[in-house]
């Protein structure tokens, strides 16, 4: 079985648009900007043998305020630019989330990818910037790493580790693997 690093998209891989202290996803390709150091961090993790899986909630599609084709275009661009092995997406808005198993903080996206790619969750990581990512990682049984931007929201579960960027998270993962 393989080890993986599960990555939230907005705020971890690409710049999240921030309004009133809260992050929002880009609504078009022109707004999709990969953060500095992300390409190098992903390359480092791939070279060390990790699978890279994006797990992202995109409820604006379910709400009808964004087209699924635009999300797919953003993911196609993402996969052209970074060595991503799989992208898992939940389109369910909050009201429908109680009926799905995939919207973070539920672990469905991670569990689905783990089955498809033969991932050992006990040797894997979830890197995110919000409480939903951390709770999802805990529910899936992976080590959680919070990229702490100081958003105006409280954590429900404490992350195993806190960092300031994906580059720092990648270095931490490689250090932990060497122990």
Locate each region found by the language model.
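Substrate-recognition element of Asp-dependent hydrolases with the DxDx(T/V) motif
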Residues: 38-71, 75, 84-93, 137
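Active-site neighborhood of HAD-like aspartate-dependent phosphohydrolases
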Residues: 1-51
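Short, solvent-exposed loop/turn segments at secondary-structure junctions
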Residues: 12, 59-60, 132
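Conserved protein kinase catalytic core
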Residues: 14-16, 21, 63, 135, ...
């Amino acid at each position: 079985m393989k080890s993986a690093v599960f990555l939230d998209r907005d705020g971890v891989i690409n710049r999240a648009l921030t309004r009133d202290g809260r992050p929002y996803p880009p609504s078009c390709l022109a707004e999709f900007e990969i953060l500095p150091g992300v390409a190098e961090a992903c390359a480092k993790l791939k070279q060390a043998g990790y699978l890279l899986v994006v797990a992202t909630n995109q409820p604006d599609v379910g709400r009808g305020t964004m087209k699924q084709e635009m999300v797919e275009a953003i993911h196609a661009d993402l996969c052209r630019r970074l060595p991503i092995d799989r992208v898992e997406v939940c389109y369910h808005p909050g009201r429908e989330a109680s009926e799905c198993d995939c919207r973070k903080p539920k672990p469905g996206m991670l569990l689905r990818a783990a089955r498809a790619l033969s991932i050992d969750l006990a040797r894997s990581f979830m890197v995110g910037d919000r409480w939903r990512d951390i709770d999802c990682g805990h529910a899936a049984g992976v080590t959680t790493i919070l990229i702490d931007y100081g958003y105006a929201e409280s954590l429900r579960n404490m992350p195993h580790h806190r960092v300031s960027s994906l580059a720092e998270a990648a270095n931490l993962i490689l250090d932990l693997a060497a122990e």
